[in-house]
């Protein structure tokens, strides 16, 4: 970040009173003074340290307005299902031959989808795919026989919700070029997903402790959520 541009950004925004997203979006966009289309990102802290257990969330949210990113999707499936994946928009499709390429280190994709029957073979590559977050997972909808749905969802815009050991979750709501309505739609989808996840967890009190909204090269603002989750 250039020092000139940084000096022009507002200071101590994290200390300001939390505000609703509709009021923060214009402020955030005003601070997006770089030449590229910056991402508008959420930083969420959850109450994951419970007395009798530790909460670890891992799920996906389908962003109704999309993510603004072009995702390269790969599919491992039986030959008889390959055309379905291709027609849905998969960039790379293969079976045993593709698994061998992955084994040799060819990871030219950002999302990997696999059918249950092929997962037995693919699971042996956990040391390659796991550290990069590419291993398909039934909870994330990436181990499935419904390849059309999985590919379309991945292409249209999904975000993974996963907290670290300190309860932090980071994800993008879209781009600076998005309209306010699109950003709000995606934000509400994230809240709805977290609310559903909370109902499946042994949590006492609120799940969400704090939420901040920022841009790629900007500053953070504390976000007020419309309801306790």
Task: Give the ranges of each region predicted by the language model.
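Flexible, glycine/charged-enriched surface loops at secondary-structure junctions
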Residues: 36-40, 197-210
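Residue-level signature of catalytic and energy-coupling elements of molecular machines
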Residues: 24, 85, 130, 213
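Glycine-rich phosphate-binding loops that contact phosphosugars or nucleotide phosphates
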Residues: 84-91
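Long, charge-patterned amphipathic alpha-helical coiled-coil/hairpin "stalk" segments used as oligomerization
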Residues: 91-197
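Generic N-terminal amphipathic, Lys/Arg-enriched alpha-helix
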Residues: 1-14, 21
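Flexible glycine-/small-residue-rich
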Residues: 46, 77, 116, 173-175, ...
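Translation machinery proteins
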Residues: 22, 26-83
């Amino acid at each position: 970040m250039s020092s000139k541009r940084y000096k022009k950004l507002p200071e101590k925004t994290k200390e300001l009173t939390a505000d609703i997203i509709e009021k923060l979006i214009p402020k955030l966009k005003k601070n997006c003074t770089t030449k590229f289309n910056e991402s508008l990102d959420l930083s969420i802290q959850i109450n994951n340290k419970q007395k009798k257990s530790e909460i670890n969330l891992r799920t996906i949210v389908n962003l109704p307005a999309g993510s603004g990113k072009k995702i390269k999707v790969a599919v491992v499936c039986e030959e008889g299902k390959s055309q379905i994946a291709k027609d849905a928009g998969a960039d790379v499709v293969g079976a045993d031959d593709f698994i061998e390429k992955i084994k040799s280190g060819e990871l030219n994709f950002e999302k990997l989808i696999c059918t249950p029957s092929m997962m037995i073979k693919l699971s042996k590559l956990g040391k390659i795919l796991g550290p990069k977050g590419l291993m398909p997972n039934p909870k994330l909808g990436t181990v499935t026989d419904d390849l059309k749905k999985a590919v379309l969802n991945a292409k249209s815009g999904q975000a993974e919700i996963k907290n670290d050991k300190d309860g932090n979750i980071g994800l993008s709501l879209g781009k600076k070029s998005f309209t306010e309505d699109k950003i709000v739609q995606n934000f509400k989808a994230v809240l709805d997903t977290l609310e559903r996840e909370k109902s499946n967890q042994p949590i006492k009190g609120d799940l969400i402790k704090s939420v901040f909204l920022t841009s790629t090269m900007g500053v953070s603002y504390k976000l007020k959520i419309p309801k306790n989750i």
